[in-house]
Swiss-Prot record:
GO terms for biological process: protein localization to cell surface. This is Uroplakin-1b. GO terms for cellular component: apical plasma membrane urothelial plaque; endoplasmic reticulum; membrane; plasma membrane; protein-containing complex. It comes from Bos taurus (Bovine). Residues 37-60, 108-229 are extracellular. It is found in: Membrane. N-glycosylated with high-mannose oligosaccharides. Component of the asymmetric unit membrane (AUM); a highly specialized biomembrane elaborated by terminally differentiated urothelial cells. May play an important role in normal bladder epithelial physiology, possibly in regulating membrane permeability of superficial umbrella cells or in stabilizing the apical membrane through AUM/cytoskeletal interactions. Belongs to the tetraspanin (TM4SF) family.
Length: 260
């Protein structure tokens, strides 16, 4: 292939442009995954307690892929500009490996969205919230994390339980074992608070008088951020894979036409 041919130069330009887009998207993917794993909503303890935090694993893979794709896009640009078969061969091999990792990340993130059901968080809350009799230290750590997270959620977001205050009444729970039904029909965090973070009217809250306790459940406030992050990691990653596929295909065609 003649390197001074105008058609070749145009094709090189297209491939370079494709790799520039890959590099830019990889930075965005990395930033998105960093934001996710930084746990801005402080919900990780709830997932950790379920023993299924694969969505975070998908985000960590996405971070790794973002770094690798950026480096490989630079390598690809250099190989195309120099029309170097060896550089491009290394580019292909590494890109296929990274591509496989990103496929795994996308599939994991997409499938985990179906995992965030009300019953999952309800079962975990009933078993672990204020559970002071764990079988081992690992469970104690998880129980403490779940308790602190639920306390913060209910206070900060003015909600109670997964589906509502009735969760604490309808089901057997560690909280019910530790507290009497008359004095603690639900956690104090379910009460409407004053400026000092004290119940506005404790007796009215315990009796379930409207306006003195929070009747809304917390499920949407938990699943919403997790689903959005899982959707972003999965589908933005999938979009990058689609673009990368065509860039790789074009680069392979270009590689096959380079003179030895």
């Amino acid at each position: 292939m003649a390197k001074d041919d105008s058609t070749v130069r145009c094709f090189q330009g297209l491939l370079i442009f494709g790799n520039v887009i890959i590099g830019m998207c990889s930075i965005a993917l990395m930033a998105e995954c960093i934001f996710f794993v930084s746990d801005q909503n402080s919900l990780y303890p709830l997932l950790e307690a379920t023993n299924n935090d694969d969505i975070y694993a998908a985000a960590w893979i996405g971070m790794f892929v973002g770094i690798c794709l950026f480096c490989l896009s630079v390598l690809g640009i250099v190989g195309i500009m120099k029309s170097n078969r060896k550089i491009l061969l290394v580019y292909f091999i590494l890109m296929f490996i990274v591509y496989a990792f990103e496929v795994a990340s996308c599939i994991t993130a997409a499938t985990q969205r179906d995992f965030f059901t009300p019953n999952l968080f309800l079962k975990q809350m009933l078993e672990r919230y204020q559970n002071n009799s764990p079988p081992n230290n690992d469970d104690q750590w998880k129980n403490n994390g779940v308790t602190k997270t639920w306390d913060r959620l209910m206070l900060q977001d003015n909600c109670c339980g997964v589906n509502g205050p009735s969760d604490w009444q309808k089901y057997t729970s560690a909280f019910r074992t530790e507290n009497s039904d008359a004095d603690y029909p639900w956690p104090r965090q379910c009460c409407v608070m004053n400026s000092l973070k004290e119940p506005l009217n404790l007796d009215a809250c315990k009796l379930g008088v409207p306006g003195y306790y929070h009747s809304q459940g917390c499920y949407e406030l938990i699943s919403g951020p997790m689903n959005r992050h899982a959707w972003g990691v999965a589908w933005f990653g999938f979009a990058i894979l689609c673009w990368t596929f065509w860039v790789l295909l074009g680069t392979m065609f270009y590689w096959s036409r380079i003179d030895y």
